[in-house]
Amino acid sequence: MRKLSWQHIVLIVLAIILILWIISLLLCRKPVRPTYQVPIIQPMQVIQPHQNDIDPAWQTTYSPNNTDNQNQQYVLYYFNNPSCPHCKNFSSTWDMLKNNFRSINNLSLKEISTDKQENEHLVFYYNIRRVPTIILVTPDKNLEYSGNKSLEDLTQFIRSNMNQ
């Protein structure tokens, strides 16, 4: 048998140490735990009218439990966004609709701007995904209007669902 030089012995020892180190890494590896992340969707915070800093004369928030709506049997919500071109086109029809139904005592018409932070709870509650959206709240159900946004069709929708 041939004698190994000191350089070969050092290389063999280093190779053995390297192999043992790799085996220990593979076998004794700690499980990787994900780091804590802040949830992407923050819990919604409902602003009560008496707790915010907005002057009550300027408040435009309406909630399903608002005392203003409790004496009204029916509420027609119009969800819009000022930057939406379809909402701008529909605004004249909405104004005529408000004038036509102004004299009906048990119907309240509410215009809700989806870009205002104080209306976020309504947008979430009624699951508003697009604007303009019209929802008629009756004593027993909520009806989303999906037809033509003409004055005649909306009037027919309101009258037919109020006379059930």
UniProtKB/Swiss-Prot annotation:
GO terms for biological process: protein folding. Gene3D superfamilies: Glutaredoxin (3.40.30.10). GO terms for cellular component: host cell membrane; membrane; virion component. SUPFAM superfamilies: Thioredoxin-like (SSF52833). Residues 36-163 form the Thioredoxin domain. Disulfide bonds join 84-87. The keyword Iron does not apply. It is a single-pass membrane protein. It comes from the Viruses. It is found in: Host membrane; Virion. One of its GO terms (molecular function) is protein disulfide isomerase activity. Keywords: Disulfide bond, Host membrane, Membrane, Redox-active center, Transmembrane, Transmembrane helix, Virion. The keyword Membrane applies. The chain crosses the membrane at residues 8-28. Pfam families: Thioredoxin. Belongs to the thioredoxin family. This is Thioredoxin domain-containing protein R443. It comes from Acanthamoeba polyphaga mimivirus (APMV).
